[in-house]
Amino acid sequence: MTEPTPLTTPEADAPPSALAAGLDRKVAGISIGIVVLFVAASLGFPDWTANVINSGFSGAAKWFGAYWQYLLLITFFVAIILAFTPYAKARLSTGKPEFTRFKWVSMIMCTLLAGGGVFWAAAEPIAHYIASPPYYGDSLESESDQASAALAQSFVDWGFLAWAILGTLGAIVITHAHSKGMPLRPRTLLYPIMGKKVLHSWIGTVADVVAIIAVVAGTVGPVGFLGLQVSYGLAEMTGIPNNYATQLIVIAVLTGIAALSVSSGLNKGIQILSRANVWLAIALMAAVVVLGSAGYVFKAFLGGFGTYIGNFVGMSVYQGDPTWLSGWTVFFFGWFLGYGPLMAIFVARISRGRTIRDLIICTAVIPPVLTTVWFSVLGGTGIMFEQQNPGSVGAAYESDGLPAVVMSIAAQLPLSGLVGGAFLLLTVTFVATTTDSMSYAIAQSCTISGEPSTKLRATWAVMMGVAAAVLIAIGDGGISGLQSFIVITAVPVGFLMLPSVFAAPIYARRMA
């Protein structure tokens, strides 16, 4: 493969007015316009908007779900094979790493997990325990088998494949292209097939806009759900009214934290918040294990992880029940795929000085393993309580959804008030970390060259908070619709990520 002619200075052909501001007004304007249009349509025509989104979601899942499953699986295997080649010793850039390994991995982990790191970790295993995944049919004979299958399915949705698409091959392509003068923007993922032409092509503009909208949808959704979930939790714990005013206060606090964090930059706010988040998660995980049952959690992890590895390929590409898949695996894979381009930009930016092997191991191996442990602690403890007292967790999930599972687990532990409060705090910090990191990546995607301005970073954080606050005014439907929209945007993003599968190994060889 002949390497495309590099563009030494992306600024060379940029219009002077755009360069002076550093802002790509076309990309920023179109992206903001689409977000505003979606919010306005949701408020003015909620039923029509919901029908359009649901139809688009169903079509995307039906026609592209299998493609996403195989794309994520192939990406993971290519990345792992690449990690064991001599080329993996190549560094992503010259100089020493900008962050310590702990800070670096913390930033990567907290950005992806968001609120799902708490609520889905507790709720998804329970959901699959109550209604076993169709992959297993009627083969699950005991409660232990059901628990292992429930955890294994959760690991499929949040495990190795989800992490591999976010920060491995795409980050390698972006880093290599950036060394040739390309910007840290989603369009750079097309560098392997378009070269420098993508800089000023309408295709590049479309790539940037689609990637930005996907991440906005995937971030505003958790922010809005956070308002609903924390408001519910506060009402359960303290009696504070679970109403729109409480939800707005929660969103305002989170948005303020994210805006301040992203304004202070990578070296201050973002990495400090990520590190604090990880320590709080470790403390809470230890508390749940000690106050619950360490023995049960350990056995649950071994059973779930063993089932996951033993059925890894089969579960990852399972096609037997399209309706069920669209609500679980395909939904999550589409969501993570939508995050792929901007996560690749973010990971590439914070991974300067790291080797390719470091990048792959610390993105596609360590975080997903830690995620399975985390899901085993929260979800496994919930399953244990459900086995001991049927309905104590499952009934709460079926009646009140995600936040009810976390609070019902906390309520059955000693020091329930303290543990429940820690869960809510951790959820806020998780979502705030995702919001600040993705605000940085969105701002970077709207910037022609160099670092995005502080004002632009903060503006995107505030804008996503405002969008979430407006959408929850019409209830769960507005936020759910936006989260479904990310699956629709995953259709073009899936093709945007495809060149990395073939180009990353070639670029790794050239970097070695």
Regions of interest found by a model, annotated:
Residues E11-L19, N51-F57, F84-F102, I126-L151, ...:
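Flexible loop linkers connecting adjacent transmembrane helices
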Residues P15-A21, F45-A60, A79-E98, A149-V156, ...:
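Membrane-water interface regions at transmembrane-helix termini and the short interhelical loops
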Residues A18-L43, F76-V78, A114-G117, D157-F225, ...:
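Helix-loop-helix module between adjacent transmembrane segments
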Residues A20-I30, A88-S106, G295, K299, ...:
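C-terminal membrane-solvent junction of multi-pass transporters and transport-like membrane proteins
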Residues R25-I32, G59-T75, T111, Q146-A177, ...:
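Extracellular loop-to-transmembrane helix junctions
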Residues I34, Y67-A83, A281-G292, L370-G380, ...:
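Hydrophobic alpha-helical segments of multi-pass membrane transport proteins
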Residues V198-V206, V210-R354, I361, I366-G420:
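Membrane-embedded translocation segments of transport machinery
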